[in-house]
Each structure stands twice: as C-alpha cells, then as structure tokens.
Amino acid sequence: MKLLVVSNRLPLTVKKSKDGFEYTKTSGGLVTGLRGISDKIRFMWLGNISGVELDEEEKKVIRKDCWEKFHSIPVFIDPVLNSNSYDGFCNAILWPIIHSFKDDVAFTIKDYNAYVEYNTIFCEEICKIVEDGDIVWVHDYHLMILPEMLRKKSDKSFKIMFFLHAQFPPAEIMETLACRREIVSGMAHSDLIAFHSFDYAINFDDTCRANKVEVRSKLDAIPIGIDPAMFRSALKEEKTVERIKELREMFRGRKILLGVDRTDYIKGMPHRVKGFQRFLEKHPEFLDNVVFLQVGVPSRTSVKEYSSYITKMNELVSETNSKFGSIESVHLYFLNKSVDFNELCALYAVSDMLLVTSLQDGMNLVALEYISCQNENNGVLLLSSNAGASTTLPAAVEVNSWNTEEIADGIHRAITMSLEERTERHEINRKAVDTFTSVEWAEKNLDGLCDDWRESLML
C-alpha cells in the first residue's frame, strides 16, 4: 500500500540556474497541513510544477530531482492550458461560486474544457503509478472531477479520498454553475469526501440530491490543523528573537493589530480597514496608542478581480493614514508582499491582536498559527463567524465581518480586555490548536477510509 497525495501544485517552485534547476519550498494551507505529517506518515506527492516552457530533457531532469530530493512526482502542464484552467475556470468561475460570490461570474465553455483537460492529464499520470491496494488522496477544487475520471480509466482496485479545503455553498448557489452536475458527480466517485465543517458536507449532499447524483461516498467533517511545534520552534531561533526585539522597539507604547492574508476578496480586508477606521472614530483616545500591520500576500494577480482588489486596498490605506495620521504617526501599514517564516512568526508573537475578517472562508489557518505563537503574550483573536476556523477556536472574539460596526466594537473589546480574560481565552484556543493538529487531521481522514493503513504508512 502507498499513499499518493494529489494537489494542483507541488509545494515547490522551480527556476533555471547555471547548474540546472533551483527548487524553493512554498507555503499555503495544504502545504502547512501536510508538512506537519511528513515525519509521521509515508506518502508521495503528485502535482503541477510547470508554468514555463520546458523541453523533454529538462522535464527528465526535474522528474529525477523531484523524486530524489522531495519524493514527489511532477505533472507538466502547457502554460496556456494551465492559465485557462487555473485562472479562467478555477479562480474566475469556480472559486467565487463555492464561496457564494456568484454575481459577477460568467461561465465559459473554453475555460471549463481546459479544466477537464487539466484533470485528464492528472488522471493519466496517476494511472501510470497507482496499484491495487493504494490510497489516492485528492485535494481541493482544482481537481473535483478527477475521482470519477480515475474510476473510469483505471482497472486497478484502489481507494480515493477527496478533501475540499474551501467552502461548499448551499445548493441554490451551486444551481448557478452550468457544470454543477459534472462537479458533484466527479467528487461522488470518491470513497471518502471530507470537508472542514458539517455545513459544507450537508450542502454537498443537498446539491447531489438536487441534481440526481447518487452519493455512495462516506461524507465527513474533519477540520484541518497545523503543526504548532514548528511555529514555536521558530520563535526560539536567533533570527526570530532579534526581529521580535526590533518590532517591539519600533512600536513601543502602542498596541499592535495584525492581519495576514492572501490578497483575495473573500478575506474581507477592506471591511477590516473600514472597521478599524470606525474604531478610531468612536475611540479617538486610542489614536496615539494603536498601529495596524496588514500583510497582503499577492495572489492570482492575473485575474482582474484580484488585481483591482489591491488597488482598492491601497486607496483605503492612504485614506486611513490621511484621515487619522500625522507626520509623526502612521496608523496603518500595508505590506503587499510575502514574508519569510521567521518574519511571520515574529509578527504573530509581538501582536496584541489578530484580525481574521473573512467574508467567507473554508478554514483560515492563519488564526491557528497566531494562537501557536502567543503563549507569552496571550493576544486576542478577532475571528469572522463565516470562517471555518470559528468551529475550531471557540474562545475567539467572533464578529460578523460584513458589519464594520461590529468589527470596530470587537477591536475595542479586545484592546480593553483584562489580562485574566485574555489568558483564559488563549488557553482554550491553545488546547484546541494542540489537539487538532495536522497529524490528527490526516489520521482521521485515513481512519475514515480504512482500518489497516497504519501497518503500511506509519513511519
């Protein structure tokens, strides 16, 4: 038995160098989840690594490097096909609909056909290596129709798990998607389909019923976790310790509010900034005592809705600092770039409060990462009730992220919260993060599929 993890992309980027190719590990929710299990569970990873033109000899070198260095199998996709599937269908059509942002979506058959071809290439690569008794673990919305393809193409006897890292919307939202039946039918050929919450599982089942798709799969809710030890270990590294000192000195005497998000419209960053503005209007006594640091990691910038989102954020940042700031004092910093892991952990550690105000969000692991870095500070988590993490972290200060007044009041509540209450809330959330780890998540998925996997896959 072998476990084959299948995702849209390998957790690597590759670029040409003088001596061949350079490989850089990437981050993200799935990567964070699976990196935590790599020393406990044996698996190989299959995913797209292309995006540039490569000749056959270069592909051969990359295949060898990926297997020997990362125990991974690269899938090579033509750049135009990749763009039409990833940007055109996945992120301009499927992503907004599954997060209930359906109004500006226009279905195009060209992009859907690219999605089908993309999944077909994955299917062909998997069929080359899958054997009787194996487990194929398919991840996320980029590969929703892959399970059905595998069942139809392969004559091998293997099990399929599917995990959706995003939301799954109510059936009436899915009704707006022209290919909805193909999508849910594709998923329904899995042995196990797992979601972050039971609400998403119920929505999937309702959509199948509405479209007369038979579901023989086992449906479950298994929220993903992180490896908290990885973050706490980074806090002890000299680079992180020094950066924490620098940040504390830089913002001495001020409460630090933090946001860390991809620049994605589902994350609700403009609503967060407007909530922060409203807080400053209602409580001017805090004007000289707070600073808001917002990290916006660039995401899907080739999709129009995402690039215009950054423009909107820059306008709001300028508006906030013009209205409330001065030559000596800036209230809102917006960093539109990725930060390295040590910098991220330092930001988590020094912040008095993290704002997660997603309008819709499958999970949001940033909330869990923040908790894992707050054992000394007992910072407060302001969390959207529309994020899947709200079911995992019961002691967060929960807000309706569509309501800027509620965000403003939540900020005030967090800033003025007593040390006793902060400590109590943090301890409840810490226990949740330490209990529902990425290893626990993977084990629960595998346990839901079969009983004998430990004998073959545990390291």
Swiss-Prot record:
Organism: Encephalitozoon cuniculi (strain GB-M1) (Microsporidian parasite)
PANTHER family: BCDNA.GH08860, TREHALOSE-6-PHOSPHATE SYNTHASE
SUPFAM superfamilies (UniProt xref): UDP-Glycosyltransferase/glycogen phosphorylase
Lineage: Eukaryota, Fungi, Fungi incertae sedis, Microsporidia, Unikaryonidae
Record key words, sorted: Cytoplasm, Glycosyltransferase, Stress response, Transferase
Protein name as annotated: Alpha,alpha-trehalose-phosphate synthase [UDP-forming]
Coiled-coil regions, chain positions: none
Transmembrane portions of the chain: none
Family of the protein in this entry: Belongs to the glycosyltransferase 20 family.
Binding site for D-glucose 6-phosphate: 86, 140, 300
InterPro entries: Glyco_trans_20
Pfam family, one: Glyco_transf_20
